[in-house]
């Protein structure tokens, strides 16, 4: 089956065209700056790249551009739309409606629309991507794969907030969790690597990127995760605060005369390691600055790793033991300094970390960074959310 996988952002559209038999991306690319000046498409196939600048006023135009590239005489991969079997969409928030991927119909679109208030930056764009495909590739099934779905197995005592119960009943305010597609994918990959059934394993997965979250996975099911009602909770991130005392927000709003929008901006865009360091949200810049003696940059790195480590301890308690700790995503896969800070001094848990292996880890494959006698495995597992979306699409359509 050949699946077009789409990840629609508010001003970008990432795509991959995946053959599910070989699990290879035949081509991929991104349409960037949708609705903004300087829009372009970057398309890659077999290591070759083509960049085309043109006005892209909305997601419909973006989808048209993608289809043009897929059927391009030199850089394309198909002769006609008939060769696209299905389209798999990343949808950020599925609320309590969806605990699995789903074939899109009017009812599904209505539910995605109802979750817009939970993910105002992402869900409208995800929906635009779906509707653009219905218009431009009619008659082909669209499948929605939700970031929140994997975490719908969390027990109620884990996902509820200790607010008046009526608040949950009225507004569905609870922990939802995100990055579910990534957490699920790396858990499956880790089980394959360990040659053990996923349903026998206790795993802690650390998806560390510009947005970061940790997940406790017991026997293949998510039982807790660090993000919450929104992707703002949990770890300190690139520009997001992570969990803070809610009274701080009230105090600051009063002292600084801030409205809700300004506070939202502060928490989502000006906080995290950027806010602490005053340097950057990028860990490469932070490490460079820290090495040059910038104390705030060092503090930002230390705070980030300290929180990850706290979640590892917390989730080890929740799971009643751990078989493997997994690092994935941009920072998790590529930053040995962060990994080291997160897993040193965990000998009491049975984690025997190997510095040599960590700093010489091979990129692009599952790699073990623990000593042979370590009771707990520490693994780097490259994530592949697009492939997971293609797999879910295939699984649903072959049911």
Swiss-Prot record:
SUPFAM superfamilies: Actin-like ATPase domain (SSF53067)
Binding residue positions for ATP: 14, 207-211, 282-284, 330-334
EC category name: transferase
E.C. code: 2.7.2.1
Binding site for substrate: 90
A Pfam match: Acetate_kinase
Entry-linked PROSITE patterns: ACETATE_KINASE_1, ACETATE_KINASE_2
Co-factor(s): Mg(2+); Mn(2+)
Annotated Gene Ontology cellular component terms: cytoplasm
Keywords carried by this UniProt record: ATP-binding, Cytoplasm, Kinase, Magnesium, Metal-binding, Nucleotide-binding, Transferase
Single GO MF annotation: magnesium ion binding
Pathway the protein acts in: Metabolic intermediate biosynthesis; acetyl-CoA biosynthesis; acetyl-CoA from acetate: step 1/2
Cofactor note: Mg(2+). Can also accept Mn(2+).
Residues of the site described as Transition state stabilizer: 179, 240
Localization per record: Cytoplasm
Cited Gene3D superfamilies: 3.30.420.40
Gene Ontology BP annotations: acetate metabolic process; acetyl-CoA biosynthetic process
Active site per UniProt: 147
Family: Belongs to the acetokinase family.
Name assigned to this protein: Acetate kinase
High-level lineage: Bacteria, Bacillati, Bacillota, Bacillota incertae sedis, Caldicellulosiruptorales
Gene: ackA
